[in-house]
Amino acid sequence: MKRTFQPSLLKRKKNHGFRLRMATKSGRKILSHRRRKNRCKLTVSDK
């Protein structure tokens, strides 16, 4: 049986990347909350 998690960096960035977060109001809200919490990585596209 094939496992459900088949990791792909491209798909990951397309769905949870910085550009996508900035594109929507709720995404920007997520970023602001993560900035307020002083997260090292805001999105998955951060290294």
From Swiss-Prot:
Gene3D superfamilies to which the protein is assigned, alphabetical: 1.10.287.3980
Query: Which InterPro entries does the UniProt entry name for this protein?
Result: Ribosomal_bL34, Ribosomal_bL34_CS
Question: What cellular-component terms does GO give this entry?
Answer: ribonucleoprotein complex; ribosome
Q: Which UniProt keywords apply?
A: Ribonucleoprotein, Ribosomal protein
The Swiss-Prot or TrEMBL record annotates one GO molecular function as: structural constituent of ribosome
Instruction: Supply one GO BP term.
Output: translation
Lineage: superkingdom: Bacteria
**Known PANTHER family for this protein?**
LARGE RIBOSOMAL SUBUNIT PROTEIN BL34M (PTHR14503:SF4), MITOCHONDRIAL RIBOSOMAL PROTEIN 34 FAMILY MEMBER (PTHR14503)
Would you identify the family this protein belongs to, as annotated? Belongs to the bacterial ribosomal protein bL34 family.
| Record protein name field | Large ribosomal subunit protein bL34
Q: What is the lineage of its organism?
A: Bacteria, Pseudomonadati, Pseudomonadota, Gammaproteobacteria, Enterobacterales
